[in-house]
């Protein structure tokens, strides 16, 4: 699974996983970028030239290591900030009933990651007599690409999924703005 963004000039950023979280508990999050004919780690270190592709996933540094942490993950979004540094959102799944949203920003040296909020469980609706097929479908968390300090998300509050806007500060502090409340249907 992969998400892309670009500076619309010379750089393409890739956010990806090594699989689907229902298939394996060891699903991690990776980031690389392509510029001037080369694939590079987030820190700028060359991985390989375009002519040497494909990129071998085992050579790519992890943003989040599911093996080390023992919790599977899945990607949501990627944008570039005003300094052309990547900002990402993704989910972690301690269990099928407990989804968590994360926000990570590259500061030029390292990834700074914060837990945004618990997301609730899966948003998949199970029809009577049917079994759950997609336990890792969260409500979602996406970035405002014109200002990636801002995220929009859907999380379970009470019995419904509600929408929120959050502004993430430089030190991880958050301002929360509910966009829906006391809804009768999921958002």
Predicted regions located by residue number:
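Extracellular, repeat-based ectodomains that mediate carbohydrate processing or recognition
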Residues: 1-187
């Amino acid at each position: 699974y992969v998400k892309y963004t670009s500076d619309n000039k010379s750089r393409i950023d890739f956010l990806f996983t090594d699989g689907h979280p229902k298939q394996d508990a060891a699903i991690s999050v990776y980031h690389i970028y392509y510029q001037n004919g080369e694939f590079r780690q987030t820190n700028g270190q060359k991985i390989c030239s375009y002519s040497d592709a494909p990129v071998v996933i085992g050579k790519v540094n992890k943003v989040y290591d599911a093996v080390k942490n023992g919790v599977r993950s899945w990607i949501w979004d990627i944008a570039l900030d005003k300094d052309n540094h990547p900002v990402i959102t993704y989910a972690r799944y301690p269990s099928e009933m407990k989804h968590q949203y994360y926000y990570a920003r590259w500061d030029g040296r390292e990834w700074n990651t914060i837990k945004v909020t618990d997301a609730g469980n899966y948003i998949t609706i199970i029809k009577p007599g049917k079994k759950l097929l997609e336990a890792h479908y969260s409500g979602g968390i996406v970035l405002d690409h014109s200002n990636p300090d801002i995220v929009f998300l859907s999380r379970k509050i009470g019995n419904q999924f509600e929408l929120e806007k959050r502004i993430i500060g430089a030190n991880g502090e958050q301002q929360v703005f509910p966009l829906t409340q006391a809804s009768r249907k999921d958002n």
